[in-house]
């Protein structure tokens, strides 16, 4: 551990978009992304949700892994399980983040700072960046910055098949 008792962790998550008509809601960075009123029926499919056991919120999930990694407490799968019957099944990323913060506290750690980079063509994160930062910061209890990028049409995110996120987090021993 560093002299100041600050530890860093990194997390990553990626999910495929659900097929059109699946009824899955699109949740990213703790926010629901509804189909815009001005959206054509053909474009509405681009707001289909993300496949996953929970809400598929890649930003929240990457942040969970970063926080747990920093405290050396495992990862999202070790805390919430995997599969339809797991502890995390059907849950929202924000709820899971709040549980992780409580788990950190019970193990003597507190979040100090975090950053999440969302990788994908859609939705356009910049339009709601401040809202996303506020939602994640409130859930974690420390400042969380949110950035977004594309892969210039390369790979599964570039082809619009899915979305990914990378997060870094600092935790302090309390």
Swiss-Prot record:
Tell me which SUPFAM superfamilies the record gives.
IpsF-like
Site for Transition state stabilizer, residues: 53, 150
Q: Which CDD domains match?
A: MECDP_synthase
Please give the cofactor(s) recorded in the UniProt entry for this protein. a divalent metal cation
UniProt pathway annotation: Isoprenoid biosynthesis; isopentenyl diphosphate biosynthesis via DXP pathway; isopentenyl diphosphate from 1-deoxy-D-xylulose 5-phosphate: step 4/6
What keywords is this UniProt entry annotated with? Answer: Isoprene biosynthesis, Lyase, Metal-binding
Q: How is the cofactor bound?
A: Binds 1 divalent metal cation per subunit.
The positions annotated for binding a divalent metal cation are 13, 15, 61
Tagged with keyword S-adenosyl-L-methionine: no
Record-annotated residues binding 4-CDP-2-C-methyl-D-erythritol 2-phosphate? 13-15, 75-77, 149-152, 156, 159
Stated EC number for the protein is: 4.6.1.12
- Reactions performed catalytically: 4-CDP-2-C-methyl-D-erythritol 2-phosphate = 2-C-methyl-D-erythritol 2,4-cyclic diphosphate + CMP
Query: Main EC class of this protein?
Result: lyase
* GO terms assigned for molecular function: 2-C-methyl-D-erythritol 2,4-cyclodiphosphate synthase activity; metal ion binding
* Gene Ontology BP annotations: isopentenyl diphosphate biosynthetic process, methylerythritol 4-phosphate pathway; terpenoid biosynthetic process
The record's annotation in Pfam families points to:
YgbB
Role: Involved in the biosynthesis of isopentenyl diphosphate (IPP) and dimethylallyl diphosphate (DMAPP), two major building blocks of isoprenoid compounds. Catalyzes the conversion of 4-diphosphocytidyl-2-C-methyl-D-erythritol 2-phosphate (CDP-ME2P) to 2-C-methyl-D-erythritol 2,4-cyclodiphosphate (ME-CPP) with a corresponding release of cytidine 5-monophosphate (CMP).
On subunit structure and binding partners, the annotation says: Homotrimer.
Q: Sorted alphabetically, which PANTHER family does this protein's record hold? A: 2-C-METHYL-D-ERYTHRITOL 2,4-CYCLODIPHOSPHATE SYNTHASE, CHLOROPLASTIC
Protein family per UniProt: Belongs to the IspF family.
What is the protein's name according to its record?
2-C-methyl-D-erythritol 2,4-cyclodiphosphate synthase
Organism listed in the record = Bifidobacterium longum subsp. infantis (strain ATCC 15697 / DSM 20088 / JCM 1222 / NCTC 11817 / S12)
